[in-house]
Amino acid sequence: VEYRPSEKYTIENTTMNPFETKSVTFAEPIEMLYACHGKVRRFCGQVAMLSDYIAENGCNQIVLQTIRQIAQYFNVAAPLHHEDEEENFFPLLLQYAPQAQESVNELLRQHVSLHGNWDAVAAEFAKLEADNAYVPDAEAFKRFVAGYDVHLAIEEPLFDMGKTFIPKEKLTEIGEIMAARRRR
């Protein structure tokens, strides 16, 4: 996610349903992982805009609604997504494409730092909710977005590798596991 101030994005136009999947189902688990990344990009775009928006408009209802949606995604869906990768996709990928081991190891390390970056952003969100005059730490927001920029650039080529090397029936199996994870 690269935030370009010249683009005409506004926080008002980017609120979204965090569970929208554009007709992708767990029958296509790699497409579902990509769909999650689409949400991550959109939410990171919102996080990237927050500091400037708040400086210009204050912490209004739009900001509060936006941070609640972002928090819902990163508190609920993102940990499930990481679990899908760590417990299902990465191990299966390594069975069929062991050359991905170095990238998988790096991504697993990054999952830890991404969670830490989220904790810092969530703390800023909590302060904003408690005190609408609070000025959030823009650096925490930048670290969060930058962490995902790097992460997605390494991870998505592995999704393509999975499409190439993992048999369809194995993908179907992990898709069922991923769907069941969300029903528990």
Q: Across the structure, where does each feature detected by a protein language model lie?
A:
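Small-residue-biased structural context
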Residues: 3-184
